[in-house]
Amino acid sequence: MHTLGGKKVLLGISGSIAAYKAPLLVRLLIKKGAEVKVVLTPSAMDFVTPTTLSTLSKNPVNTSFTEIKDEQDNPEWNNHVELSLWADFIIIAPATSNTISSMASARCDNLLLACYLSAKCPVFVAPSMDLDMYKHPGNQENLNKLKSFGNIILESESGDLASGLNGKGRMMEPKNIIKYLIKDLKNELPLKGKKILISAGPTYEKIDPVRFIGNFSSGKMGFSLAEAATNLGA
């Protein structure tokens, strides 16, 4: 079952080395049934190309407020409000310290920040930076400020960093972002809080101590029902 089926996701990518994980995140979102549109900051294009992301998302990638979209080289305005209203939720991954600071102070000097400020949907933020940058009081203050706005912080993970250090600051892995989204989505699902008992596999009914009546059920139907119920919040 497509656990994100029909959901519209606006993925914002800022200029971090972790941007190389963005194509995988796009693929996982689509695999789960979501429709994905991508917004790149100018610095993000130093790490990942619009061509890659448009190929995977099957949608044009937005990089600036205006883009050339016709043969006469006439610039066309990218409507950030329209993009934000289209989305069921926004994911900013990776979110650099600079982007987080801009979001916290309501700056609007690129298309991604304009989309963020126009958002009426849940916004998920996945910080990505070096260990000491992540721990800096100013950055922590900005993250707490975003939380106070109602944004959801996808906590950075610990591990090897691009600087060679080891510690907290890595962007949450794409597979874990997907798990978090699905878990959050379950709060809206129709079977949330319901307990369902499903039997699966072959059954045997004794005739006597030696013989029985049975079947060759594989249990696949029961397992599929259990998976579907789980995906609906049970």
Outline where the language-model segments fall.
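A cross-family phosphate/adenosyl-ligand binding-site feature
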Residues: 1-124, 130-219, 223-234
